[in-house]
């Protein structure tokens, strides 16, 4: 790989590290200070809204605006946001301050990551684009693994201020490197219409294709939104509440739990690559079934009088399995979209798929935040109800795929795995990346 690509990789590492640390620490800080799962859910949900709105616009901007300037401006904005947080912490409302910081963070990343992805073809040789894209994607996954672990350790030992300071320094270093080192060729594109009108046209064209020619894809995306409403939101809100409040463990343990989620995502991606020739799209719902069943041990943790460390081990194992299975389903789903969508629509359809699949995430976080507060003394029904809902959605997905693939006569059976992403099942406060089954930093995948 050439020097230009290496320089982009270095600045991406710095920026995504700061992003992952903050996405983990700020909602947990709200939970620690207020003790309210509902407030933590509200903070996380509010932060998601600009991400959902700006992601399609970010894709258009990445194609039409100087990519180097976008990256430098966003990292500078994030560094200044961290500085403002440190200056205002303790003097203004905590929840409002965290919401503002996370909104800026999510909004920036909705534009930053598409810009990095769009820069790859300009700085990597044609024969190395697939490899370069895979490297960029793996850096994102690794940041979700390392960031929460380090963030949890620093937050648990020293509090929120050093965490924000470290993240701000990472953003500042990234901005300086972009200005001094990164070089991305840029040719100004002619624009016949405004960005918003262009985005609206892309969405309309993509939706018309899905509804008219590939309804099986549209139905599957909506079912993934259901998974994000239930299973993903349960994990995002339930994991930190369970670890820090119900089990009474230090914040460092929550960092390791988030690391387990990220490791599950990496493991799922590796397994799909290894088993690619044996997996078919018709088998994909099996992974959703397994993810749903993996919630049952969490019900035991919430209801049985187990030793905290034993309960923590069961919880971490369950989170790992959930994320691995969600990622495997996501990768198969996004590969199916790539194969079944005309080349000129692929990017637009994937962007629409990610927005639709993630749109239920904020609603789920609000609902589960309220449930964990209202039913703090008896959370077993919440876990069992979530598992039951996920099993029903998995069964519906199985039915939709079997009927849809047969009815539409698609030639896709064994799905060739793409190295560039997955359909987001969102499981992360750190991030979503595939057909998003969201287990957002607890990692955003269908993602």
Question: Which stretches of residues belong to each language-model region?
Answer:
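Juxtamembrane intracellular "pre-TM" segments in multi-pass secondary transporters
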Residues: 1-5, 184-222, 416-421
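Hydrophobic alpha-helical transmembrane segments
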Residues: 95-106, 128-189, 259, 313, ...
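Primarily residues marking transmembrane-helix entry/exit sites
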Residues: 1-9, 37, 95, 99, ...
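Substrate-agnostic recognition of the 12-TM MFS/MFS-like secondary transporter fold
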Residues: 7-23, 47-60, 66-78, 97-156, ...
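A single, central transmembrane helix in multi-pass transporters
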Residues: 24-25, 158-165, 208-271
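Membrane-helix boundary and inter-helical linker elements of multi-pass secondary transporters
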Residues: 32-33, 63-64, 90-91, 122, ...
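Small-residue hotspots at the loop-to-helix junctions and early N-terminal turns
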Residues: 22-25, 29, 34-41, 134, ...
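C-terminal transmembrane bundle of multi-pass solute transporters/carriers
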Residues: 53, 57, 70, 84, ...
């Amino acid at each position: 790989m050439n020097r230009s690509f290496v320089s982009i990789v270095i600045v991406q590492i710095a920026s995504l590290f700061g992003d992952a640390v903050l996405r983990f620490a700020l909602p947990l800080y709200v939970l620690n200070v207020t003790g309210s799962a509902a407030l933590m859910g509200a903070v996380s949900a509010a932060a998601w809204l600009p991400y959902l709105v700006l992601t399609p616009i970010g894709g258009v901007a990445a194609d039409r605006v100087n990519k180097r300037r976008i990256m430098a401006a966003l990292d500078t904005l994030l560094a200044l946001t961290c500085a403002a947080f440190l200056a205002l912490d303790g003097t203004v409302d905590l929840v409002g301050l965290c919401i503002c910081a996370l909104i800026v963070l999510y909004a920036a990343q909705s534009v930053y990551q598409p810009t990095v992805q769009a820069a790859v073809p300009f700085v990597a040789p044609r024969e190395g684009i697939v490899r370069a894209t895979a490297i960029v994607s793996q850096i994102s996954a690794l940041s979700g693994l390392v960031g929460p672990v380090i963030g949890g350790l620093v937050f648990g030992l020293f509090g929120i201020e050093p965490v924000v300071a470290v993240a701000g320094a990472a953003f500042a270093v990234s901005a300086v490197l972009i200005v001094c080192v990164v070089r991305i060729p840029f040719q100004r594109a002619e624009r016949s219409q405004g960005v918003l009108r262009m985005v609206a046209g892309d969405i309309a064209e993509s939706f018309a294709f899905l509804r008219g020619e590939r309804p099986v894809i549209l139905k599957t995306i909506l079912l993934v939104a259901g998974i994000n409403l239930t299973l993903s939101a349960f994990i995002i809100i339930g994991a930190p509440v369970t670890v820090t409040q119900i089990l009474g463990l230090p914040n460092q343990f929550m960092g390791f739990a988030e690391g387990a989620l990220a490791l599950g995502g990496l493991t799922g991606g590796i397994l799909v690559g290894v088993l690619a020739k044996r997996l078919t799209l018709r088998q994909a719902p099996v992974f959703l079934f397994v993810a749903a069943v993996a919630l049952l041990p969490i019900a035991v943790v919430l209801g049985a009088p187990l030793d905290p460390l034993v309960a923590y081990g069961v919880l971490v194992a369950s989170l790992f399995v959930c994320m691995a299975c969600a990622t495997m389903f996501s990768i198969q789903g996004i590969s199916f979209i790539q194969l079944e969508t005309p080349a000129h629509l692929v990017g637009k359809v994937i962007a629409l798929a990610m927005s639709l699949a993630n749109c239920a995430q904020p609603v789920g976080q609000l609902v589960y935040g309220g449930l964990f507060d209202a039913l703090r003394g008896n959370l077993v029904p919440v876990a069992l109800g979530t598992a039951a809902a996920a099993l029903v959605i998995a069964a519906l997905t199985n039915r939709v795929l079997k009927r849809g693939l047969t009815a539409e006569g698609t030639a896709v059976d064994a799905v060739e795995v793409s190295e560039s992403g997955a359909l987001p099942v969102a499981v992360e406060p750190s991030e979503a990346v595939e057909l998003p089954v969201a287990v957002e930093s607890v990692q955003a995948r269908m993602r």
